[in-house]
């Protein structure tokens, strides 16, 4: 079966999301080993700041007079962690968010709203920041009712798999209403199970039916 027309229809509705994370580490001044390698020899706390990037996906769900709106996962859009080890403590939080459209154009995005319990977030990009050619290349997704999904129907997943850009995978709906308890926040959610390949970076991406909805 040829799904090229379906892919061509849906790819413009999906974006890649880059979360730029700022990590600040502070050494424990009392750690002789850490101070030996990273300190100033005076047994004082040392602070360093670095940046890293995390990748995910999003789906274009609306356009206002001023903004383009995209839905993604909370854990893709928001990063906020603190921790301690024997040698240092650290904080890591989102510094900025960027989205990349189907034509490769990358622009800064703002967090419009988020719900960590539902693991959902909405990003917004100013229309004035998007080139006209890009606006003509992208489109808004059609959202259908998940209550109408049936076991066995075909699906196409699109996302920024492994942070390497948009990828399409195909499969079927394997089961519905699966109660799954997540390991990170111990929240139980009712899930749809599919057998299309889903990789790191697909989070927040689109799952489309045969009509491209």
Residue ranges of each PLM-predicted region?
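Serine-dependent protease modules
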Residues: 1-213
């Amino acid at each position: 079966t040829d799904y090229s027309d379906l892919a061509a229809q849906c790819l413009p509705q999906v974006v890649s999301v880059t979360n730029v994370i700022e990590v600040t580490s502070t050494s424990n001044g009392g750690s002789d080993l850490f101070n030996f390698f990273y300190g100033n020899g005076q047994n004082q706390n040392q602070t360093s700041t670095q940046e890293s990037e995390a990748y995910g996906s999003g789906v274009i769900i609306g356009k206002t007079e001023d903004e383009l709106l995209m839905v993604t996962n909370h854990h893709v859009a928001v990063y906020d962690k603190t921790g301690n080890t024997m040698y240092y403590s650290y904080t890591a939080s989102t510094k900025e968010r960027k989205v990349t459209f189907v034509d490769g154009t990358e622009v800064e995005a703002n967090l419009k709203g988020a719900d960590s319990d539902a693991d959902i977030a909405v990003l917004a990009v100013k229309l004035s920041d998007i080139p006209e050619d890009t606006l003509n290349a992208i489109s808004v997704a059609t959202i259908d009712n998940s209550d109408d999904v049936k076991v066995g129907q075909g699906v196409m997943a699109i996302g920024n798999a492994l942070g390497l850009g948009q990828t399409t995978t195909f499969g079927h709906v394997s089961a519905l209403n699966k109660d799954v308890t997540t390991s990170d926040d111990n929240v139980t959610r009712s899930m749809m199970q599919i057998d299309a390949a889903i990789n790191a970076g697909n989070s927040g991406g689109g799952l489309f039916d045969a009509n491209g909805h």
